[in-house]
């Protein structure tokens, strides 16, 4: 069965995107009431995601995490794997490893 997912900005991603940013309680309670089952987390930096808070709020509102996306990282810090700058690519690879580790922390969340 198809489950609805909605993009939500991590707390450190203060940028205008096609995603909902702000207080997790406000966002997650609305998404839950509208029938959403999961959120897509848009992050700026894998090291600054408040894992305990996010896990607690996802569980409180019975929501899962469908994916982790890097739009804010690319738009705010210009970090991406295809950069012509080798230093930027190295930073992107470091962040990619952080994303994998971050994703593993949510394996048991709904």
At which residue positions do the language-model features occur?
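N-terminal pre-domain/capping segments
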Residues: 1-108
């Amino acid at each position: 069965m198809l489950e609805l997912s909605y993009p939500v900005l991590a707390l450190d991603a203060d940028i205008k995107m096609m995603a909902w940013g702000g207080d997790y309680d406000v966002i997650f309670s609305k998404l839950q009431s509208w029938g959403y089952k999961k959120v897509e987390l848009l992050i700026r930096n894998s090291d600054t995601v408040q894992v305990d808070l996010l896990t607690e709020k996802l569980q409180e509102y019975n929501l899962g995490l469908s994916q982790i996306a890097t739009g804010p990282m690319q738009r705010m810090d210009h970090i991406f794997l295809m950069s012509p700058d080798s230093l930027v690519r190295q930073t992107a690879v470091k962040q990619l490893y952080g994303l994998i580790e971050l994703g593993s922390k949510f394996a048991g969340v709904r």
